[in-house]
Amino acid sequence: MDRADIVHEAFLARVSAGEFPSGDAPYGPLSGFEAVAIFRAQCLSRNLDRRSRKMQSAGQGFYTIGSSGHEGMAAVASALRRDDMAFLHYRDGAFQTRRSAMVPGTTPAWDMLLSFSTAKSDPLSGGRHKVLGSKAMNIPPQTSTIASHLPKAVGAAYSISLAKRHPPEHKVLKDDSIVMCSFGDASANHSTAQGAINTACWTSYQSVPLPLLFVCEDNDIGISTRTPQGWIGASFANKPGLKYFKANGLDLFDTFCVAQAAAEYVRKRKKPAFLHLSLVRLYGHAGADLQQTYLAKSIFEEWEQNDPLLHSARLLTESGVLTADEVLSIYIETEEQCARVAEEVIQQQRLSTSQEVMASIVPPKRECKLTNGPSEEARETAFGSDIQQMEKPQNMSRLINWALTDLMLEYPEIIMMSEDVGRKGGVYGVTQKLCDRFGQDRVIDTLLDEQSILGLAIGLAHNGFIPLPEIQFLAYFHNAEDQIRGEAATLSFFSNGQFTNPMVLRIAGLGYQKGFGGHFHNDNSLAVLRDIPGVIVACPSHGADAVKMLRECLRLAREEQRVVVFVEPIALYPMRDLHDEKDGGWMHTYPAMDESVSLGEVGVTGNGPLAIITYGNGHYLSQQAAKVLKQQGIEIRIVDIRWIAPLPAEGILSAIDGAQKVLVVDECRGTGGQAEALFAMLTERSDLPVARLAAEDSFIATGPAYAATMPSRESIIAAATKLWNTL
């Protein structure tokens, strides 16, 4: 017999016989009415788990990682307000069923079963995935098994007090809300969880408000690996700035009492707390997990003896709230409800086409207040003496600084965050004076942890802010890429566009820094960004474009709720000259306030029959090469694609109309570089002869060989000449 059926039959038999596991007497402030509501949610969650397994075995359901053994989370839901944002562990079905009962109009059994069956009418994901979550219940969807939702929970909690001082237009959380995030004991060991909890402690230690409740659901095992006894308590009980609470998660009275105290502490003190619940795991990790292959039978039989529903039944009967017959009636009623609803659910349509699946990758547009831009008085106050320099040509670094200033003046919901972004003004000085102009609330110096930086941004976006996080160097993004790839980029997809986290992520990157940094400060690979569905990647090549593209990126985030990555070529920050020393050929005046470059709009210079398609540093070098090639009788047109993703195919094809040959110049590596996508597109949609010049598949060296592996003016000239002379 399946373990789920064994536990089910044991529950019915033991309640009927009055044979309950031992435990403490019921105590605390939990009312009988609330206790019954919690138990009903527990029973519903349990029977949803059982039904999901039956659906899966019949080919009608597609998810069997259940919440059985973790039903104590229903008591945690009761201890919180329904408007407290909750980032849930994947075993928190009971939390959702309990909160659902607190929100009028929700139908937990129907909704969860629709999710199990991946029905198009699933109210959260639209049939794309089985995820816990609900817009009405303030539960953003989570699918993570590695605690990657903890960093954004920290960010969301941080946003609450920030929103009091700087109310964003699209504010979500109330001023006295708290944020809850839950995770398993195994996930607590993951670097992402460790980093997020450390960030919460670091923040709280400095008396910065952070109303966040961590809930660790400790069932002593992660798939097959046991958690050392006492490990969670020893690890988290004495963290600076973090209050530790411990409860028996099998006891709904104890769990409610302690969870209520923890929530009250967080809400009143505006400090983070860690609620440690002792639980059991029933049935194994998932339906396909045969726990008997790695656990002694006596171990999981002991867990089954401690079934939390049996503990709840004992407590409810001992306290006189319910009789044994009433306990069984609730359990059987929810079982029959799940069976009845499942028969209806399996008749629902499922997604079948790529268009249907992809429909929610790009989030919906939203209504935003119209603005007239910052006033001249505000600009004069903010810029000071800098405003006198705006009519003179400047390098990219200064122009980006001015663009950020104007944007922050116009949109008070913009918040910047990174290591050294504030008082220092950034490693390259791009954010100089911004902290003085807008204060430490809006230009935040963070601790050194890229996952926490991006998590802070995602969390702020959940509460209506427009975050502008910065990653100091492109190579450092790899430390935290899942925060974009697995979290930010998937939110609209998994919520059918109901939840969004718009942002503009600035990354200083690419190569060609003279004699500085080697690989870790010069990374010429954008592959990690290019294939993330829905993410926009921009890369300006000079200051004027940087300003105009940054304005468009901000608009895309604010109005279209997009996740945008803005890659700033480090080597071009200070670039002044193009061909000759002091020619000022790569400096530009500050663009007028109404100027921008639209998504997909490419830049074109020249109209020669040989087209060079490039971006970033490649554009700069191609301009140098074009001058020499012209002297040799080869006329060039240069197409700066500007937008790395999505590839601006229509703009590129229009720009090369009339050309005879095409050379793709890619400063990124030959393997995984942008040239691969360009070559594929041109092969599919154009008959022109095409060649490419890309960087070697190599890391970047420090010292005189800093550019040896990447395209140069000379190599572009040689490649263009060879292509042009090829019949």
Locate the predicted segments by residue.
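Cofactor-binding active-site loop characterized by glycine-rich and histidine/acidic residues
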Residues: 47-50, 54-212, 223-241, 519, ...
